[in-house]
UniProtKB/Swiss-Prot annotation:
Its main location: membrane. Residues 85-96 have a biased composition (Basic and acidic residues). This is Opalin. Induction: By leukemia inhibitory factor (LIF) and cAMP analogs. Suppressed in the presence of astrocytic or neural-stem-like differentiation factors such as bone morphotic protein (BMP) and fetal calf serum. It is found in: Cell membrane. The keyword Membrane applies. Residues 1-30 are extracellular.
Amino acid sequence: MSFSLNFTLPSNTTSSPVVTSAKATDCGPSIGLAAGIPSLLATALLVALLFTLIQRRRTIDDEPVEETEIPCEISELYDNPKISENPRRSPTHEMNPRGSQEGHIYVKTVSGSEEPLPDTYRPPEELERRRGLWWLVPSLSLE
């Protein structure tokens, strides 16, 4: 199946098509205005959003620092059982063998001694040294 259009023009006209049977109704600027309303609305909403974001940032920047930051006493750090960094260790960041920086975090236990917190994001070194597809086999232990 093929579809073709064949326009024939009278010899005395230019390249504008001739309307013969339908009424020539001009919709005028109403269609153009209706088509432009969604884009105008979207532009207005975008401007309103930017204005509110700028106003919020200005109000946050105008607040004094003393109201937003609460100073913490040193005694509160030592009395708090939460995680705290060991102040006696001078280099807080060391380079590991792979070249990335590593921070040391210590946990103060109930007995008062400080132990390093195990890194839960990185697997232990012995698991990284395994080769091949042995990591697919589940490790069974009786412990």
